[in-house]
Curated annotation (Swiss-Prot):
This is Phosphomethylpyrimidine synthase. Pfam families: ThiC-associated, ThiC_Rad_SAM. Belongs to the ThiC family. It catalyses: 5-amino-1-(5-phospho-beta-D-ribosyl)imidazole + S-adenosyl-L-methionine = 4-amino-2-methyl-5-(phosphooxymethyl)pyrimidine + CO + 5'-deoxyadenosine + formate + L-methionine + 3 H(+). Its cofactor is [4Fe-4S] cluster. Substrate binds at residues 248, 277, 306, 342, 362-364, 403-406, 442, 469.
Length: 643
């Protein structure tokens, strides 16, 4: 069942689990150059260091927040009305778009007039779609190349910096040891960024709006922000920024309802999904997507060929350019921010997959391969690519050029079909850039660790540093049920090498449609991989959160340890399985080692002894050894004593 008959728009409500703030956290907003540039962040409050450890103040930590208004107690959430149109005034003020009299897509008009879908439709949209005025280009890349810094670019610069400078200043002002504390907490290991411009000796001290503009103008970063998705909070995808992650959701022909997919979206962004892809393949795709977009503060991506295939009852050979074009316009006018389009699957590459272990595993890739073979013609996506660009730039939809020939097993990694398609994607990127259309490139797949860097190096070369967006890659094929881990390993590596966004993999990969728990597991695993990549690249400020958590751990501030982690709920749950009492939250040990074998407790004891003796820690250890030596001789120099 793909549309739960119990779902009625009149009864729709937000998932209560998605709206509560995380423990000891609150939503804060940083205002930009104009009052409506209000950039959300999550402020994590910390306890003061106990007197026994120095009695220091620990100011709040600020972290990137993708949850939108859902975790803001002051926001009124009604998913039947959708989110506020945050960017609407910015879009209108540019004066290069117009409101349409109605939907342009034939299919969109048919759905709006179909009484059978009346009870499923999103009821809260009271505006018509927008499109570029004749002769205008409304992409963020076009503005960037004109030297224009948009409000979206300023928003992103503030967001990427995460108030790092303010945090260090608050440390300096925290007490007599403030300067020393700021130096310690701001310390970071040098990274290896493999030539990325934002790292190393020439790195900017902070991300500026001008830096954002320049990266977008060069094509090294994209801002997915359809003019018909004004509810979205601007974000950026590029190798010189924080590594982002995507969460896939969507119904299928056999399971899930509209309500469940909206819940998955709100759950995914709560835990850190930077973008969400709706990969629905069942009925009511149009209605499901509308509900998701209107309630999403993050960019939404789709694979339009999936819906086009539904329109021809699943028969790939009956697809036409006209049906696909209408689908693009339908989705662009709903507000989809980026389209995965498998225009690199060319007729000449299909035979190259014949000797693969797992053939063509991409759904979109297999659809286009079947069409090419059925008609023995070049793909209509490839043939009509410039026309697709014209549609994209009228709504500012970004390309996510699909890897339809990605390897589905490590056996097939880096083969001729995969790399041939990648080279074609580089050629298509140049065509899109000619139209000032934003582009990112999708990548594999299943790749053993020793072949991952080759993928990244070839992509940077052939696609001229357009952002890379990879599914993992999975580094081994032996762990069904654990592919969030097999892929998380590859994701951390390729993120370090330069991938800009990682598409999450859940434990259900290859096995079934993920539920909410699987979504969270995939998100947390990939947030971890992305952060590890930021650390390895030497992203400015990436280590601040690690330093704060390590300090909390050493000072036995258990609540702060939980709250500074990626998943406070799980950390607290694991701790409380063995030490559930409140008193354990201030204990100087955990259940791993107990009170007598805690390495950190022993270190603290050494420091206390040193302070009492008025000597250094090294001298304290030496003095302690001497005391024990005297005790040993006095006891008879016996290693063992009979009881």
């Amino acid at each position: 069942m793909n549309a739960n008959p119990k779902f009625l728009s009149a009864d729709a409500h937000v998932d209560a689990a998605a709206v509560a703030p995380l423990p000891n956290s609150r939503k804060v907003y940083v205002t930009g150059s104009q009052p409506d540039i209000r950039v959300p962040m999550r402020e994590i409050t910390q306890a003061d260091t106990p007197t026994g450890f120095g009695g220091e103040k620990n100011p709040p930590i600020y972290v990137y927040d993708t949850s939108g208004p859902y975790t803001d107690p002051d926001a009124k959430i009604d998913i039947r009305a959708g989110l506020p149109a945050l960017r609407q005034r910015w879009i209108e003020a540019r004066g290069d778009t117009e409101t349409l009299p109605g939907l342009s897509s034939q299919y969109g008009r048919e759905r709006a007039a179909d009484p059978a879908t009346a009870d499923l439709r999103f009821p809260g949209l009271h505006r018509n779609p927008r499109r570029a005025r004749a002769g205008k280009n409304v992409t963020q890349m076009h503005y960037a190349r004109q030297g224009i810094i948009t409000p979206e670019m300023e928003f992103i610069a503030i967001r990427e910096n995460q108030r790092r400078a303010e945090y260090l200043e608050s440390l300096k002002a925290s007490g007599p040891n403030g300067a020393k504390l700021a130096a310690m907490m701001g310390r970071q290991h040098p990274g290896q960024a493999f030539g990325a411009a934002a790292f190393g000796g020439n790195a900017p001290s902070e991300i500026t709006p001008e830096f954002v503009r320049d990266e977008v103008a060069r094509g090294r970063a994209i801002i997915p922000a359809n003019i018909n998705h004004p509810e979205s909070e601007p974000m950026i995808i590029g190798r010189n920024f924080l590594v982002k992650i995507n969460a896939n959701i969507g119904n299928s022909a056999v399971t899930s309802s509209i309500g469940e997919e909206v819940d998955k979206m709100t759950w995914a962004i709560r835990w850190g999904g930077d973008t969400v892809m709706d990969l629905s393949t069942g009925k009511h795709i149009h209605e499901t997507r509308e509900w998701i977009i209107r309630n999403s503060p993050v960019p939404i991506g789709t694979v339009p060929i999936y819906q086009a295939l539904e329109k021809v009852n699943g028969k790939a050979e009956e697809l036409t350019w006209e049906i696909f074009r209408d689908t693009l316009i339908e989705q662009a006018e709903q507000g989809v921010d980026y389209f995965t389009i498998h225009a690199g699957v060319r007729l000449q590459y299909v035979p190259l997959t014949a000797n693969r272990m797992t053939g063509i595993v991409s759904r979109g890739g297999s659809i286009m391969a079947k069409w090419c073979l059925a008609h023995h013609k070049e793909s209509f996506l490839y043939e009509h690519f410039e026309e697709i660009c014209e549609i994209m730039k009228a709504y500012d939809v970004s390309f996510s050029l699909g890897d339809g020939l990605r390897p589905g097993s490590i056996y097939d990694a880096n083969d001729e079909a995969q790399l041939g398609e990648l080279k074609t994607l580089g050629e298509l990127t140049q065509i899109a850039w000619k139209h000032d259309v934003q582009v990112m490139i999708e990548g594999p797949g299943h790749v053993p660790m020793q072949l991952i860097k080759e993928n990244m190096d070839l992509q940077l070369d052939w696609c001229k540093e357009a952002p890379f967006y990879t599914l993992g890659p999975l580094t081994t094929d032996i762990a069904p049920g654990y592919d969030h881990i097999t892929s998380g390993i590859g994701a951390a590596m390729i993120g370090w090498f330069g991938t800009a966004m990682l598409c999450y993999v859940t434990p259900k990969e290859h096995l079934g449609l993920p539920n909410k728990d699987d979504v969270k597991e995939g998100i947390i695993t990939y947030k971890l991989a992305a952060h590890a990549a930021d650390l390895a690249k030497g992203h400015p400020g990436a280590q601040v959160r690690d330093n704060a958590l390590s300090k909390a751990r050493f000072e036995f501030r258990w609540e702060d340890q939980f709250n500074l982690g990626l998943d406070p709920d799980k950390a607290r749950e694991f701790h409380d399985e063995t030490l559930p009492k409140d008193s354990a939250k201030v204990a100087h040990f955990c259940s791993m080692c107990g009170p007598h074998f805690c390495s950190m407790k022993i270190t603290q004891d050494v420091r206390e002894f040193a302070a009492q003796q008025g000597v250094s820690e090294a001298d304290a250890l030496q003095k302690g050894m001497e005391v024990k030596a005297v005790e040993f001789v006095k006891s008879g120099s016996e290693i063992y004593h009979r009881q």
